[in-house]
Regions:
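Extracellular calcium-associated, cysteine-rich motifs in secreted modular proteins
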Residues: 93-187, 192
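Conserved beta-strand elements of the Class I
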Residues: 192-196, 311
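Soluble non-cytosolic domains of exported or imported proteins
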Residues: 5, 20-24, 36-41, 156, ...
Length: 332
């Protein structure tokens, strides 16, 4: 079996229609990619030749250490040498990739509609959805009526005839004529929980099996589409807004789930379904104001009264993602 055939076999593990797209790309471009690897070109050089790297003017698109320099003993290529090296590779292999326009949105169009970090499927525009991924109920409480923007998790209402806040409590006690929402929830300090932050907030995770050749199989990618639609994040299993069991996402995740939301719900069932995770991969502290504008407690979104919310702001991943080795990033 050739290397190209072996890679095509891996493509077959992907769910439809991505298996066909992957196999097609490999059949077209696989031989040239493999030849470049055999010629010891680094991933950065290959990405530059293929054309999937973008960089600001005057910057070099690189992630890994530059290749070794032929001019310096035990040294790496300078920026100028690296750019010349890339130009040589383009001259040798560029024709093979001419016309290739790689756009992830062509593969996952729905996933590219979440740039504003709001639910993709939200008919009534209340920031809550009946669909799980794509910033839906995996991230925020599940909408119980996506055709009515006055019905959403976190609303402060007596719910006499309808469960307007989607916590499962509505109706009136026939013996006292008191709404159940008032009877059970009034005076209990019921509230929601929300968090604004980065990839650590969103619980970013690449399933290890995706990167382990010996574990590649159709089962490995059984949750592939959902994982991509959730940006490789697992907010439904996070420490802040976790509300699901890892067994539902096997084999990608295992172990117990515990969260602030689960503890608050355990202490007071009036808090059921009232959570929001606005964690974004690669976010910085400067994004927090923007994120706060899509928190459903914003009165500019709805004038209807809403319950209080316990709000966290967490930029936990900055130490990992920053390019600057400043003192606060050191273990000390």
């Amino acid at each position: 079996m050739s290397v190209t055939q072996a890679i095509s076999q891996v493509c077959g593990y992907l769910p439809s229609p991505y298996d066909y797209t992957c196999s097609t790309l490999i059949s077209w471009y696989g031989p040239s990619l493999i030849k470049m690897m055999e010629d010891n070109y680094t991933p950065d050089v290959i990405c530059n030749v293929v054309g999937v790297c973008t960089a600001e003017s005057g910057q070099t698109c690189s992630l890994f250490p530059n290749p070794k320099s032929s001019k310096m003993l035990n040294g790496l290529m300078s920026k100028v040498e690296f750019e010349q090296h890339v130009a040589e590779a383009k001259g040798k292999y560029g024709e093979s990739f001419k016309g290739l326009k790689f756009n992830a949105c062509d593969w996952f169009p729905a996933a590219c509609r979440i740039g504003d970090h709001k639910p993709v499927f939200d008919e009534d525009g209340d920031l809550f959805s009946t669909y799980g991924p794509l910033r839906g109920s995996d991230w925020r409480g599940q909408d119980c009526d996506d055709t009515h923007n006055g019905i959403f998790p976190g609303r402060h209402d007596l719910d006499i005839a309808t469960d307007n806040n989607c916590n499962g409590i509505f109706g009136v006690d026939p013996t006292t004529n008191v709404p159940f929402e008032k009877q059970w929830c009034e005076g209990t300090n019921s509230m929601g929980v929300a968090i604004l932050g980065d990839s650590a907030t969103a619980h970013f995770r690449i399933p290890p099996a995706y990167l382990t050749a010996s574990k590649l199989s159709a089962k490995t990618f059984s949750n592939f589409i959902r994982n991509i639609e959730n940006e490789l994040d697992f907010p439904m299993l996070s420490w802040s807004t976790g509300h699901r069991r890892t067994e539902e996402f096997a084999p990608d995740v295992d172990g117990p789930v515990d969260s602030i939301y689960m503890r608050m719900r355990q202490n007071n069932l009036c808090n059921h379904n009232d959570y929001q995770n606005i964690g974004v991969n690669g976010a910085s502290s400067g994004d927090l104001k923007k994120f706060s504008n899509i928190l459903s407690r914003d009165n500019l979104i709805t004038p209807l009264p809403q319950k209080p919310v316990l709000l966290f702001m967490a930029m936990i991943g900055n130490d990992v993602c920053t390019h600057d080795a400043i003192p606060r990033n050191t273990p000390e």
